[in-house]
Amino acid sequence: VDIAIAFFPTLAFRKNLIMEHIKNYIDQHKDRFLNELLDLLKIPSVSADSAYAADVMKTAEFVKDKLIAAGADKVEVCPTAGYPIVYGEKIISPNLPTVLVYGHYDVQPATPLELWDTPPFEPTIRKTAIHPEGAIFARGSCDDKGQMYMHVKAFELMMQTNTLACNVKFMIEGEEEVGSSNLGIFVKANKERLKADVVLISDTSILANDLPSIDCGLRGLSYVEVEVTGPNRDLHSGV
């Protein structure tokens, strides 16, 4: 009992030190984190419109550079038949579990522009009744650049504070908003490289702004062609 009493305060003290270290890093770098995200949101990476092809490619390079800066290894802009997939990893031990982070850097078209209070690719921070503490208004701020970049910065924080407790892999695509037609091909071709114990998807919903949520599954896409044959004469609706 005496040993236990002496031991647990040591663990608690160490935990408090780690949390203080993490908090200090966030406080020191949160302005940079925000400015980087705003720069990312300024790039009109609209995958559905070929007029923005250069911007989509520019965004892939942006993500690559930030993964490298965060501490990821083997970072690569992997070509596909469409827009590339950005891959990076940090393997700290083959004996530890591996988390594969998925996200996408492309965005939906911002039309009709007249419905926007501010330009979609000029991010602004505003307080509203729904967001009394302020929120970023821009195309992609919550689908999916905001969430995707949050994971990159969380990874950076864990690297810089020596608190990364598992292996991490990133797979960030540029065609989610147009059906991810090349994602399955990439996954099959790289199944060994992408092996993981769990996949963390940064593109889901929350139940409320003040209620973080974990989604355990998502609907997929289904393309069907339906042929309907009807009667050759008028029928009562109940027949």
Question: In which residue ranges do the predicted regions lie?
Answer:
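Fold-independent oxyanion-binding glycine-rich loops
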Residues: 103-105, 174-175, 202-205, 228-231
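Acidic/histidine-rich catalytic neighborhood of metal-dependent amide-processing enzymes
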Residues: 140-217
